[in-house]
């Protein structure tokens, strides 16, 4: 019976026939137990785990001998801090669970030829608790789950969800109230510190976890990622004739809201080591090449992305962690969990903490074992996301929305209503998140995707209310989106960032490579109104054109290391190549080749490099020729490279494949978000007047409200000034802004708002309790899920 169910289910949903095998329960249990023993022994004896324990103890105040601290710290650079673990304990738990399920899956596949030979499905249905993984039958999957439950357990208490709660959970829990995880029963689909999803079944070389490095031509490997970068992604980076850097860096700002993938902590055998010195460790996946004078080395050290178990603790291929919630919910402003959010809040006021002229607050002196910034600084800005210091324009975005929150709090508290600090904070956050969502779907995405894909995926904002929410939509950020498609924004970055004075003349400029993650550079830039000088440049200048090329600051000088703690030996490079990292990260995640994504999105196969009906018809002859000179076979092309070389669609920045992936992902963010700002749900809905005011919000209005020296701005801040996009007076925009309308639109508060805020304030750390749900076993629910229709386009 199980075999029959598996045949029919996968044939209907995927167009593939996978023979699902019943494996003896004892075999499954033995494989899981062996995997648990191997992983536990490895973690307990590893150098990296000793470091993690020391780091947790240091945060808890336990004294650590100086010798232990010095010996425990591996060599770090800006890239390490960019990809760092935000919560070492939770990251380690997820990593252990992921390793156990993957090792056991690999062992079972190796022992069962039928399972190992099962063809990969085109698409996944991750919400279906019944869906067999890697060729396992439903009963075998359940046996596996129960055996691996201990490794998939989350040590955090389970949040008890209140369906009548008006305000979001900080970490994204309790958004989807239909699918509890296994074994905890927590409703954390799309929450921070869970696994990323997938649109397509991965293409790992061993079917489970080994990176994709083999060509489809037997006996050959894929071309070196640095070689692909130099062949395809180098060249003159032209400026855009239409868009401003605000489009670039708003997109980056949103990226840090929806995904943060930490790297593994390799099990080094010696202090101050790195992957170029110990390349054979399983966490290392270096990019090796002939000595390169631009990078000053021959090895780009590369740690694999940290792994996590699946949502239901199923057997199956390697998944990657996401430290952010998979919703457009302002995580980069407010933090990834309650503890981080509380660190950002000003006690007793509802405001976010700021320093000086409403600038970002500086963190306390960093933990020496996990420094967030360069060792010479050892501090960085305190923000909702640890990457706020990455570039100056990104820091400007953080400061803008910090100020926006505090301005809204100031207006709300002037109203004669029963405000509490918690109610002020939550209501202001609710407004800011709605504004972020509206700008994303009304200004940013139309410029990226163009009208065709905005319409296909129903992404246009409605005139007022619209309820597209479905609990059957999986909102999770997917690997293909996070490590390839959405990285198109790297081609939009300028190599030089300027500061423009009130008179419109440049007064300062910085090379991109000189302010990556550099606190002192930012401190030199921002005092005395310099925030507004860079914001002025962002609205008046041009972004780089969307194409296949990356500027020198990203391709040859990413995170240049000049500090005493720079890694040394093993041919390690002094800087990184972002295009090569993107390609290597896609292989690390096991992303299928570009042609598989193109077929999934468009239904068109490509058999040859030639840009004709049976080849790369979405590419120009010039781009197709570059690809044919780089790859041995059309099915070897990496998703990032293939997508970035497609011809752009009319009115868009991208070609059809990346537009499809990004469009579907943002459709899922919208349709899978129970708190989406357009919903008419009586518990959390805005009033018609409030929603109309939010829909009149624009990035230009937020600029005028948060940049006090601005006297004017163009109507659409993401577009350059033109006859169709004229400059308008900021006083006019301020009079139309939602802040000016708060006294009229928020002069009443529903009882549900007061009750929800009171519940949050009185039990901010006690809103937890053990509630293990078995709803995913309900046959009626399984039948409902089985009828779920996949989007076809």
UniProtKB/Swiss-Prot annotation:
Signal peptide residues on this chain, from the entry's feature table: 1-20
Expression (tissue specificity): Prismatic layer of shell (at protein level). Expressed primarily in the mantle with highest level in the mantle edge and lower level in the mantle pallium.
InterPro entries tied to this protein: Haem_peroxidase_animal, Haem_peroxidase_sf, Haem_peroxidase_sf_animal
Compartments in which it is found: Secreted
One Gene Ontology cellular component: extracellular region
Main location: secreted
Biological process according to GO: response to oxidative stress
Pfam family, one: An_peroxidase
GO MF term set: heme binding; peroxidase activity
Keywords: Secreted, Signal
Family per similarity comment: Belongs to the peroxidase family.
Listed name of the protein: Peroxidase-like protein
Organism: Margaritifera margaritifera
